[in-house]
Amino acid sequence: MKYDIFISYRRVGGFETAKHLYDLLRADGYRVSFDIDTLRNGDFDIALFKRIEECRDFILIVDKHAFDRCVDNTFDRKKDWLRCELAYALSQGKNVIPVLLSGVDSLPDNLPEDIAAVVTKNGPKHTIDYFDAFYKKLCNQFLESAPSSVITFSNEGEFKTNMDDWNRPTTKVGKFLSDLFKEK
């Protein structure tokens, strides 16, 4: 299945907003990748990067602690999925849309080089009090994807047959993973 939108978030601080957006966007006909509802067993990392590659829009849910691990030099960057997802989306030229949650007024200016470009991206400010206005603005002004009239689901067998190709370092995902995990 090809996705229009990938949602990236921290489980603590961003899950509720991410899940709410996922439900609304799906109901409106967008094909949305949301890890908990749409990923199955297998190579989790490869499947995530493949989905980012397929999508046009990358929504980044930013709570007040979203970038704490990213700027912590003691934290293993290979275990920081938000950073890995964001770095890959930026490297692939995706339409990155940061959604700033309550308590976040701007993105930090001390981000690592692989994700620093996110500070140049614009997105709607999320407010619970004016959620409908936020959602309308997100869909009408920031998303490049258009809703699909028909949502199709592929079976796991079809998806699995192509997974071996994503392990090869000659593909974009393979090269990115190889670069990401090589020792420094």
Report residues per predicted region:
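Short low-complexity, flexible loop/linker segments enriched in glycine and/or proline
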Residues: 47-50, 75-77, 112-114
